[in-house]
Amino acid sequence: NVNGIRACLTKGFKDFFDSIDADFFCIQETKMQEDQIDLTINSILEDYNQYWNSAEKKGYSGTAIFCKEKPLNVTYGLGIEEHDNEGRIITLEYDKFYLVNCYTPNSKRELERLDYRQVWEDEVRKYLKRLEESKPVIYCGDLNVAHKEIDLKNPKTNHFSAGFTDEEREKMTELLNEGFIDTYRYLYPEKEEAYTWWSYMRQAREKNIGWRIDYFIVSGSIKDKIEDAKIHSDILGSDHCPIELDITL
């Protein structure tokens, strides 16, 4: 989650982008319309195919995938009108897998979007299961939930906070119960203080008072193909840090 891609590009993201040389970059919260793509972005992405799904509301939400190999097919959204005006999902289809990049809606303060979030989660889970009927799925992005107490610094004081409510955590449990794998916890089940998001308040990042709310989740059928899952907490430029999945398919 870049929290605005144009601002992030000036804060070290380009150096990270160049150094890691990934096959895919999945970006959330681009805050950008496709007609705003300029020469700066295109020069950075010259070796990549670009796929953007922007929100109807300018400067809000949005997702993008940059990939070296062209997909067989690209799908924007879930195909459900009420869920598809905020640019939150892009799916790329390849011979051996689907890649789904997602920016899950935040339940917000006072949990004003929690009811909507619950409906969203159910529809996404059904969508992923439908895809999985034909080939394995890699599902990634800012999923806006810390699943277990180990996934945030202060669980006791956040039980009613957006991102750690019982309802949101239960939806993640339901997804994993369908056979999907949280790749980071699959490899590092006991690793503490492994976070991907920090508030801008109270020097949270410097003190590592964070949450793990960004994920790579894969179909159980390809869990043995996972080589590593990494959190790049040293990369600045957003309130989130990049995460990485190394997998051979």
Where are these regions (language model features)?
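Active-site beta-strand/loop signature of hydrolases that rely on acidic residues for catalysis
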Residues: N1, F17-Q36, L99, L128-E149, ...
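Metal-dependent phosphoesterases centered on the DNase I-like endonuclease/exonuclease/phosphatase
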Residues: F24, E46-N49, W120-I209, I213
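Conserved beta strand-loop-helix elements of the APE1-like EEP
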Residues: K58-V74, E192, M201-D224
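Surface-exposed cleft-lining segments at the edges of enzyme active sites
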Residues: G79-I80, P105-E121, K156-F160
